From Swiss-Prot:
Binding site for S-adenosyl-L-methionine: 17-19, 137, 206-207, 258-260
Entry keyword annotation includes S-adenosyl-L-methionine: yes
Binding site for Zn(2+) 1: 52, 55, 74, 78
UniProt-recorded name of the protein: N-lysine methyltransferase SMYD2
Record-linked InterPro entries: H3K4_H4K5_MeTrfase, SET_dom, SET_dom_sf, SMYD2_SET, TPR-like_helical_dom_sf, Znf_MYND
Organism of origin: Bos taurus (Bovine)
Major subcellular location class: cytoplasm
Reactions accelerated catalytically: L-lysyl(4)-[histone H3] + 3 S-adenosyl-L-methionine = N(6),N(6),N(6)-trimethyl-L-lysyl(4)-[histone H3] + 3 S-adenosyl-L-homocysteine + 3 H(+); L-lysyl-[protein] + S-adenosyl-L-methionine = N(6)-methyl-L-lysyl-[protein] + S-adenosyl-L-homocysteine + H(+)
Species classification: Eukaryota, Metazoa, Chordata, Craniata, Vertebrata
Length: 433
């Protein structure tokens, strides 16, 4: 039997990659290939009160759950529909109080177990790939990853034992490994984290650093649209990672999270690497060793900053960004991706501190190189135009604001589809100013 999903696509065996998704008909840029409802999903804790727990709608005046006072809903219908999942957490949140702190992965996995019990047969999210078929890469897990899974299993038992029956430890190890490899993060139009989910049919797609589709979200529905022309017989590729970085960094990330090395055209030719690690034009050009050392420093500082976010103050974080940029600028151009990474982090800190002018200054330096380094239709570029547009509008520069927001819309009409609520909201922002 040929496994066909929404017309025009089939599951097939991709040489050297295992399972994959292939087009049976042509798709133009902006065409919707398919959509997939979430099999299981969870709203991130920090977005409670901003979004409905059930449908992820973003609106004012949501009603809170009368029992736990932690979950918010559009109306009684959303609350009732969400109860089979919310009941896993409602009374435990009251009982544990401040000590209720399972990770998002644990929360999502609890919901998968509940879903499997409520709905053991195949769901509309699994037209081409069932959750139980997910790759776990169990044989490739190192001790550190196994230890992390064991601590997740302990937390699952600790917080969810009242409302869930658990399979044995080995089955839970497999399930957590599957979630780690196949889970998705749902993000909003500015790429802020909204939650985590499982979209089985979307997980069927293999990775490429020059993807021909992009995945976006409409509430808890994933939508897959073409960002390149796709011909019948061609494989459908998405990107699993941020494509800003040079080949070696991308593959380090892919090996660490997904256990493979990419061999797409971008990785084989390394065409963009030179521009991505642009070296400052000096009368006395830096030696190869100096460049190597600075790349090593850049990677270390990126990791140091990622950790520091959890415990340092905004002003300390800004200092790390500024000092590292100063040091790197002796060797790197401003358009170098390691410089851009720290500028982006600095912009984020400025936004957090409500330093709108500071955020705008960083955004203005980032946007042109971003447009060069990323693919043509990139959510990273769209979200940067969006942030810039909103900053300009807030600082009363309407003309620049409108220009930037229109650039964001041009990308989003392809990536999200012309009828996406985000696009109507942005058009509204332009009109109301």
């Amino acid at each position: 039997m040929r496994a066909e999903g929404d017309g025009g696509l089939e599951r097939f065996c991709s040489p050297g990659k295992g399972r994959g998704l292939r087009a049976l008909q042509p798709f133009q840029v902006g065409d919707l290939l398919f959509s997939c409802p979430a099999y299981a999903y969870v709203l991130t804790v920090s977005e409670r009160g901003n979004h409905c727990e059930f449908c992820f709608a973003r609106k004012e005046g949501l009603s809170k759950c009368g029992r736990c006072k932690q979950a918010f809903y559009c109306n009684v219908e959303c609350q009732r529909e969400d109860w089979p999942m919310h009941k896993l957490e409602c009374s435990p949140m009251v009982v544990f109080g401040e000590n209720w702190n399972p990770s998002e992965t644990v929360r999502l996995t609890a919901r998968i177990l509940a879903k499997q019990k409520i709905h053991p047969e195949r769901t509309p999210s699994e037209k081409l790939l069932a959750v139980k078929e997910f790759e776990s890469h169990l044989d490739k897990l190192d001790n550190e990853k196994r230890d992390l899974i064991q601590s997740d299993i302990a937390a699952l038992h600790h917080f969810y034992s009242k409302h869930l029956e658990f399979p044995d430890n080995d089955s839970l190890v497999v399930l957590f490994a599957q979630v780690n490899c196949n889970g998705f993060t749902i993000e909003d139009e500015e790429l802020s984290h909204l939650g985590s989910a499982i979209f089985p049919d979307v997980a069927l797609m293999n990775h490429s650093c020059c993807p021909n589709v992009i995945v976006t979200y409409k509430g808890t529905l994933a939508e897959v649209r073409a960002v390149q022309e796709i011909h019948p017989g061609e494989e459908v590729f998405t990107s699993y990672i941020d494509l800003l970085y040079p080949t070696e960094d991308r593959n380090d990330r892919l090996r660490d999270s997904y256990f493979f090395t990419c061999e797409c055209q971008e990785c084989t030719t390394k065409d963009k690497d030179k521009a991505k690690v642009e070296i400052r034009k000096l009368n006395d050009p830096p030696k190869a060793e100096t460049i190597r050392d600075m790349v090593r420093y850049a990677r270390n500082v990126i990791e140091e900053f990622r950790r520091a976010k959890h415990y340092k103050s905004p002003s300390e974080l800004l200092e790390i960004c500024e000092l590292s940029q100063e040091k790197m600028s002796c060797v790197f151009e401003d358009s170098n991706v390691y410089m851009l990474h720290m500028m982006y982090q600095a912009m984020g800190v400025c936004l957090y501190m409500q330093d709108w002018e500071g955020a705008l200054r960083y955004g203005q330096k980032i946007i042109q190189p971003y447009s060069k380094h990323y693919p043509l239709y990139s959510l990273n570029v769209a979200s940067m135009w969006l942030k810039l547009g909103r900053l300009y509008m807030g600082l009363e520069n309407k003309a620049a604001g409108e220009r930037a927001l229109k650039k964001a819309i041009a990308i989003m009409e392809v990536a999200h589809g012309k009828d996406h609520p985000y696009i109507s909201e942005i058009k509204q922002e332009i009109e109301s100013h």
